[in-house]
Amino acid sequence: MTSADRRRDAVARIIRARRIGTQEELLAALERAGFRATQATLSRDLARLGARRVSGPEGAVYELGADGADGADGGLAALRGLVSSIAANASMVVIRTHPGSAPAIARAIDLAQPPEVLGTIAGDDTIFVAPAGELRPRRLAARLAELLGTPSALAGEGGDRTH
């Protein structure tokens, strides 16, 4: 087991054991457990674990997806309920998400490294996904819909063209 794997295991244990509302709290708890990490590293770990902040009566806290483990999908399975729609035009795919969810979903897509994806750009609730190579955006939209468990609403008649 690598040091990164041990650190992610510690992150998962901490999130399961108590209410963690911020990354600062989580970094402090990690340090008390003997792990040093930057905020950027912690963000990547949270994405790989499929962790997300959920609102409750006492404020937002982190929770893990069903299995809380790394997966080949980069944590996409844990984020499925946060996608509102997926659409494609002739050049790109647009994913609409619940407010604040786009960065985590884009990061999970990037971590999963699907060969069909050249890259992602995320705002607060919208993600632009550029298809790799000659892949048609409509096919990429269908693949992302499959990964995210979301029906795709394919837009535009020209969505199957590569240029």
From Swiss-Prot:
**One Gene Ontology term from the biological process aspect of the record:** L-arginine biosynthetic process
Q: List cystine links.
A: none
InterPro entries annotated for this entry? Arg_repress, Arg_repress_C, Arg_repress_C_sf, Arg_repress_DNA-bd, WH-like_DNA-bd_sf, WH_DNA-bd_sf
Question: Which subcellular locations apply to this protein?
Answer: Cytoplasm
* Alphabetical UniProt keywords: Amino-acid biosynthesis, Arginine biosynthesis, Cytoplasm, DNA-binding, Repressor, Transcription, Transcription regulation
* GO cellular component terms attached to this protein's record: cytoplasm
Q: Which domain of life is it from?
A: Bacteria
MF terms (GO), sorted A to Z: arginine binding; DNA binding; DNA-binding transcription factor activity
What is known about what this protein does?
Regulates arginine biosynthesis genes.
Q: What is this protein called?
A: Arginine repressor
Q: Which organism is it from?
A: Anaeromyxobacter dehalogenans (strain 2CP-C)
